[in-house]
Regions:
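Extracellular/virion structural assembly segments
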Residues: 1-20, 76, 82, 88-208
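Autoprocessing Asn-cyclization modules and mimics
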Residues: 3-5, 9-93
Length: 208
């Protein structure tokens, strides 16, 4: 399980929205993880912290300077590749659904095998049945959320209709994403000061 270093939420498994900006480099973007500067048509089409995809390679944007993106190559289980000039760049929805601040550091996360049931027959023999395997879970506690961040979490809650639809959560700044659902049936905020809120969010991994 990835340690919590930076939380991102998105509604799609991979960047799928056409950014309308293409790669704008002489030659190509080399097949090398040490090549981390990506020049695009318009840097304002992107946000630091979000993930992008060129061909089948997913990248994480660390920072933006004008039309140059500084990225981490080959994240979320993808492989580094060569990308020709003018290739389309796709972006994820994480800027829409990720608060500007991370949760407090007292984050609970666990691994369980609750999908395995155990029964014991007469005579003492034990039988097991695996309905599903390992499942990860997180509990994120936010304090000092500004109104805009509260609205972002409410937008995510409404986009997936509470517990109805799964979405994607990264605990490590977009390097790894997990398919998850909300654990609770309602999203509750407590106003602790003027325009300041707190909430706790439980997430459980979607397993097959």
């Amino acid at each position: 399980m990835a340690a919590l270093t930076g939380v991102r939420f998105r509604t799609e498994s991979t960047p799928a929205t056409d950014s309308t900006s293409d790669l704008n480099m002489v030659g190509n973007l080399a097949n090398n993880t040490s090549v981390t500067s990506v020049v695009v048509d318009d840097g304002t089409d992107f946000t630091a912290g979000q993930n992008i995809k060129m061909n089948s390679e997913e990248m994480h944007i660390s920072s933006i300077s004008s039309n140059t993106l500084t990225v981490v190559r080959a994240v979320n289980g993808t492989s580094v590749g060569t990308h020709n000039d003018n290739v389309s760049i796709f972006e994820d929805t994480s800027p829409t659904y990720s608060p500007s601040r991370n949760p407090d550091m007292n984050v609970d996360f666990n691994t369980d095998y609750k999908g395995i049931t155990v029964t014991q027959a007469y005579g003492g023999k034990i039988y097991t049945n695996e309905r599903y395997g390992k499942q990860l879970a997180w509990e994120l506690r936010y304090t000092n959320l500004i109104s805009a961040d509260r609205d972002i979490l409410e937008a995510l809650w409404n986009a997936v209709k509470g517990r109805k639809t799964s979405f994607y959560f990264s605990p490590d700044s977009g390097t790894t994403f997990y398919n998850v659902r909300f654990k609770e049936e309602e999203l509750t905020f407590t106003q602790t000061a003027y325009n300041i809120y707190s909430t706790t969010i439980g997430l459980i991994q979607e397993v097959s």
